[in-house]
Regions:
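Membrane-proximal transmembrane or re-entrant/amphipathic helices at the cytosolic face
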Residues: 1-18, 466-520
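Membrane-interface junctions at transmembrane-helix termini in multi-pass inner-membrane proteins
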Residues: 23-27, 153-178, 197-202, 223, ...
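Helix-loop junctions and terminal segments of transmembrane helices
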Residues: 78-94, 163, 168, 227, ...
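Membrane-interface helix-loop junctions in multi-pass transport and translocation proteins
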Residues: 52-54, 58-59, 174, 182-216, ...
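Interhelical loop/hinge segments that connect adjacent transmembrane helices in multipass membrane
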Residues: 2, 6-26, 201-205, 217-258, ...
Length: 520
């Protein structure tokens, strides 16, 4: 039973236990999120390969394209989901049942409206999309695929989002991760079986949507069981402060995730969409693992801010920033080295499109690495609720991405859209680092610059250190052996450079690990 259902009790004892509780929840969230992302990555590699072999690049591109167009319904969210999660922090930290119930009720109403908007949006897409996509499939074929895919998205908005946001804000995101992981595993196993048995893509995607229907239902059951919310509460005014101020940040996030495939769908071919999708599943899979390592940190930032524990906040942010920069540099450098050998192995036997595009691989890797570097600064801004103050930069980021992608796609194709993504993400990352230093934790921007310079140095040293390796694996086993060699060398370089430039942080990390072993 969550804290909002417990009487106030002894405040001093609660304060003493609060730090321990936060640390324990952060651990559960981090482990749960990492497990979820690993499940996502494994599923993300298995299913597209089945699609490519069974249905070809055109169908794989069509599925990716439809999913991205449906993803644009998230624009109707208007950024409210981030603001809702931030709004939950204070009432949950202070055990305010009434205020928590009001936010839950207001949010639920809003997202049910979005669910209705989704139905209208899908109806419009069913008429317009077949006219803009370059394919030989009939309108009916495409529209039925749209309907099969959209069912799960509708259920998410109608039942699930508010409950998921409440759990994340209460540092119980691990519940969401457990439910989501089970759904993904079931979907992967059943979808592969259906494809193996030769069923049509429409039925495969329909079964997937039905499986994912269970997620929001289970969220609802858990929240109803563990939270004493007044779901019939009436209130005057809007309980969600700054409700619309997350709009700009939200537009930017949706544009970054969906623009590339939309631009390729309209101005290029489904084969290019399929190629983009294969590379994207690799880079986003790695990015998600890095970002998941920071799962629960926004809620912890929010809790520290709500309790005005600024010194703890600054110390924790410094460690978080160092950890994310180090992890991002290591993981994305290794991925940049291994991505082309992997694509060679992964697409072996697929001859209806050319999946070997090295320059695109470099640019899309850089873009997602920069996006991961943005994570600590973005999480702090969201936790502090500084939506309105940073919204102009969000519009600029989205504008750069769209404008450069559209201009460049005609001559450069996949490389052009990757350039647009990289430029938009780079601008936003540098802006947020500057804003944070000036307005939230008040520190010198040189901290960020130092991290970037050491990141760049690490990349070059790792690349020069592995020049002697052969990069032509002839199968998955050979690729795994290559990956182990590259990873060991890269890890050694990162440890050495961190001992030189971040000795204090490394010592603290070693002491923490030693302490955890003793307490285990």
């Amino acid at each position: 039973m969550t804290d909002i259902n417990i009487d106030s009790g002894d405040k001093e004892l609660r304060k003493q236990n609060n730090s321990c509780s936060r640390t324990r929840k952060l651990y559960f969230n981090t482990v749960g999120a990492l497990a979820y992302r690993l499940v996502m990555v494994v599923s993300g590699f298995i299913l597209p390969r089945f699609f490519l072999v069974a249905y070809g690049s055109n169908i794989n591109g069509l599925v990716n394209s439809i999913s991205s167009f449906l993803g644009f319904i998230a624009l109707a969210d208007l950024g409210v989901s981030s603001v809702v999660e931030s709004s939950f922090y204070g009432p949950l930290a202070k055990n305010q049942r009434k205020e928590t119930s009001e936010i839950w009720k207001s949010s639920s109403r809003f997202f049910r409206v979005i669910a209705i908007v989704l139905l209208l949006y899908v109806a419009i897409l069913c008429g317009v999309y077949p006219m803009i996509v370059k394919s030989s499939y009939s309108y009916l074929y495409i529209d039925l695929l749209f309907l099969a895919i959209c069912i799960g998205t509708f259920a998410q908005y109608f039942l699930g989002i508010t409950n998921s946001l409440l759990l994340h804000a209460d540092q119980r995101g691990y519940i969401v991760y457990i439910i989501d992981s089970i759904a993904i595993i079931l979907n992967t196993v059943i979808s592969c079986a259906l494809i193996y048995w030769g069923l049509q893509i429409h039925l495969v995607k329909l079964v997937s949507s039905i499986i994912f229907l269970g997620k929001p239902i289970l969220y609802q059951v858990y929240v109803s069981t563990h939270y004493n919310l007044d779901k019939n509460i009436k209130f005057d005014g809007e309980p969600i402060k700054q409700k619309w101020n997350g709009f700009a940040q939200h537009i930017s996030a949706v544009v970054l995730d969906k623009t590339d495939i939309i631009v390729l769908t309209v101005f290029s071919t489904l084969e290019n969409v399929s190629i983009y999708g294969v590379y994207n599943l690799v880079v986003t899979g790695v990015r998600d693992i890095v970002q998941t390592s920071a799962s629960g940190i926004q809620a912890l930032f929010g809790n520290l801010l709500a309790n005005n524990e600024m010194e703890k906040l600054k110390d924790f942010f410094a460690v978080t920033e160092w950890g994310i920069h180090t992890a991002t540099t290591f993981v994305f450098t290794i991925m940049g080295i291994l991505i082309m050998p992997f694509i060679n192995v992964y697409t072996r036997g697929i001859h209806d499109a050319n999946y070997i595009v090295p320059l695109f691989a470099v640019l899309i890797t850089l873009a997602q690495a920069v996006r991961s570097l943005k994570l600590p600064y973005n999480l702090m801004v969201l936790a502090a609720g500084h939506y309105k103050q940073t919204q102009t930069s969000s519009f600029i980021e989205a504008g750069l991405n769209i404008l450069i992608s559209i201009i460049a796609v005609f001559k450069l194709g996949l490389v052009g859209v990757a350039m647009g993504t990289l430029m938009g993400m780079a601008y936003r990352t540098f802006y947020l680092a500057w804003y944070l230093s000036k307005n939230i934790i008040n520190r010198n921007i040189s901290n960020f610059i130092k991290h970037i310079l050491i990141d760049i140095l690490s990349v070059f040293v790792i690349f020069f250190s592995i020049n002697w390796l052969v990069y032509s694996p002839n199968g998955y086993i050979a690729w795994i052996i290559l990956a182990i060699k590259v990873s060991v060398i890269g890890l050694g370089v990162c440890i050495l450079l961190n001992l030189i430039f971040y000795r204090k942080e490394m010592i603290h990390l070693l002491m923490y690990v030693k302490k955890r072993k003793k307490s285990a």
